[in-house]
C-alpha cells in the first residue's frame, strides 16, 4: 500500500473537519476566519500529499496550492487580494484534485479502505468546488442567488451559505431556502444535481467491478501456482 493511499484518508479527515466542524463554528463566531483559513490551508496541502505518487500531478497541484494560499492569506492578513481570484483558484484546485483522486481510486488492484475514503473525499471535493463556483457567480453578478428572508449576505460570508447550498443540491435534497436566479447559476445547479445522481451509482459499479476483477486474478494466480 503506497503512502498516497494514506494521503487519501488524511484528505478525507481534513475535509470532514473543515466542512462539518470548522465551517459551522466560523459562521456562528466561535472559530474565526483565521482558524477556517488554517484548516483550509491544511486541506490544500493534504491534496498535494494525496497525489504525491504522480510527480507531474503533484507539481501541478502544488502550483495551484501555492497560488491559492498566497491570494487567500494576502487577503486575510492585509486586506489585499481578489476574493473572486481566490474562489476561482479554490474551484480549480478542488476539481483537479478530485479528478486525480478518482484516477487513484479506480486504478487496478484491491479496493482498500483508503481508496474508498478517497472516493468519499472526491465527492466532498466536488461539493466544495461547486460552492466556490457559486461564490464566484454571486460575486460577479450580485443578486444571482436569493437567500432566506431576502437578506443581504456580506461577500466574506458567502462561502458558508454556498457550502450548505452546494451539498443540498449535490444530494438532491433541495430545501429551496436558497434559490438560483441568474442563468449561469441555474446551469451550475443543474449540472451539480446531475452529478449528485450519477456519481454514486457509477462509483459503486466501478468499485465492485474492480474488486471482482482483482479476486478473479487472485483465483487465476492460485490455480497457476497449484
Which residue stretches match the model-derived regions?
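Central hydrophobic cores of alpha-helical transmembrane segments in multi-pass inner-membrane proteins
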Residues: 16-19, 37-49, 96-99
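Structural signature of hydrophobic alpha-helical transmembrane segments
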Residues: 24-40, 60-62, 83-95, 160-163
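Outer-pore turret/helix-boundary of cation channels
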Residues: 25-28, 127-164
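Cytoplasmic-side transmembrane-helix entry/capping segments in multi-pass membrane proteins
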Residues: 55-66, 83-92, 111-122
